[in-house]
Design a protein with these regions (language model features):
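Short loop/turn segments immediately following beta-strands, especially the blade-tip
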Residues: 13-16, 62-78, 139
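Conserved beta-propeller blade repeats
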Residues: 1, 27-44, 88-105, 109, ...
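Residue-level signature of beta-propeller blades and closely related beta-rich strand-turn architectures
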Residues: 1, 49-52, 66, 116-117, ...
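Blade-level signature of beta-propeller repeat domains, shared across WD40, Kelch, NHL, RCC1
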Residues: 123-168
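Residue position within the beta-strands of beta-propeller blades
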Residues: 1, 44-48, 110-114, 160-163
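Surface-exposed loop and turn segments in beta-propeller and other repeat-based domains
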Residues: 19-29, 69-93, 144-158
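Surface beta-strand/loop "capping" patches
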Residues: 86, 90, 97, 156-185
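Structural motif
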Residues: 4-11, 54-64, 72, 120-129
């Protein structure tokens, strides 16, 4: 595969075992998934759909691997929710409004850095918003001199469940399994 379309999401257990694809390992779309965070009480993640050779901004979307793990099968743009075509564009998501650093509060509500003007203003100037998946939004914070990025609520969040490690720390070798070297696009 080429150097451009290799920006899928991987997952693993806390002890480093079980490394596997979460989404898009054999996909051209989305080109890159940035700032991905798990949505509480679901198997979905919210992320910025972007390009490879771009800045770390793009379109706001949700990845649901239960609907599929390649191309646009489990990927949908939100704010507002809409059909999401699988586009092969290196600089994906760089036109119009721009999103960065989403933080899920629920399956439908997010804190996110956002600029409605996109690159029309240079440099792009981000403000902190509350967003609903349907596109409703409310400005929470802005600064006349700097962009607002990486919002994190100052309240406790439930600790995700962690499976017990199966590693034996006395061992110095391990095993590797390749399921099917011929599978893929």
């Amino acid at each position: 595969r080429g150097q451009v379309f290799v920006q899928g999401l991987f997952q693993m257990h806390a002890d480093g075992t079980g490394q596997t694809e979460f989404y898009g390992n054999n996909s051209w779309f989305p080109t890159a998934l940035l700032h991905a965070r798990g949505i509480p009480k679901s198997q979905e993640v919210v992320a910025v759909f972007s390009g490879h050779h771009t800045l770390q901004v793009g379109k706001l979307g949700i990845i649901n691997p239960a609907r599929g793990r390649q191309e646009n099968q489990g990927a949908r743009l939100i704010a507002p929710v809409r059909e999401t075509a699988a586009e092969r564009i290196d600089a994906y998501g760089q036109e119009g409004e721009l999103f960065a650093y989403p933080y899920p509060l629920s399956a439908a509500e997010f804190l996110v850095s956002y600029t409605p003007d996109g690159w029309a203003v240079d440099p792009a100037f981000f403000k902190l918003y509350w967003f609903h998946a349907d596109g409703r939004r409310e400005l929470l914070a802005s600064d006349p001199d700097i962009s607002c990025h990486q919002a994190i609520p100052l309240v406790p969040r439930a600790t995700p469940p962690e499976r017990q490690s199966t590693l034996d720390p006395t061992q110095h070798t391990g095993g590797f399994a390749l399921q099917d070297g011929y599978a893929g696009p």
